[in-house]
Amino acid sequence: MAGALFSLSVGGVMFATAVVIIIFSAMLYDSIVKRRSKNINPPEFTGSHQLASCNCSGGTVLLYLDFDGVLHRRMNETFERMPLLEKILKQCPELHIVVSSSWRETMTLEGLKYLFPVAFRHRIIGVTPSLQEVKDTEYVRYRECLLHARHMGVNKFIIIDDESHRFPPGCENLVSTNYSEGMTDQTVASVIMKYCQYLT
């Protein structure tokens, strides 16, 4: 009798443990899905090529920011280079970020903001339009950034990206990174230098 009761007790504990594991797994999966949830029309756009207005002052400099190969090495999604971006933002108070990364195609603007430190989220002001469906895709990333900048009435902008082939040769706006390294101290210095040149 005691043995039977012991077996039932052990069985109950195992069942309860299994239930807890299932619930935890479901919660983890749900958080991942929400993090990269599909959003075809981000808040900034009413269509794939239409842009909303933004209150940009004459001193505003836009920073078009890629993620993979920039904020982290390759596509490991750790955002390990975020402290380097923080250095830039602290020294460049009129610099505002527009996300040009392909992450903008699968996340809302609010979702993208939550990837950044709280102190700088208000400086994430939008995303670039997607021109991937256009037949002529030469220098497509540059054209997306340029379209956004022109719509905003801003001619001072910097781009950080690891895919230089998406930009015209000698593009003065581009600060290129190595896909395997991401941002470095040299990237920080180059961005700050370009920012200071715009304001002088």
Residue ranges of each PLM-predicted region?
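Alpha-helical substrate-recognition element adjacent to the catalytic core
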Residues: L51, S57-K135
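Intrinsically disordered, low-complexity, compositionally biased regions/tails
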Residues: S7, F15-A16, L51, S130, ...
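Non-catalytic pre-domain segments flanking phosphatase-related domains
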Residues: V10-G11, A18-L65
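C-terminal cap/substrate-recognition subdomain and adjoining C-terminal extension
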Residues: Y114-T200
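Short, strongly hydrophobic alpha-helical membrane anchors
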Residues: M1-S7
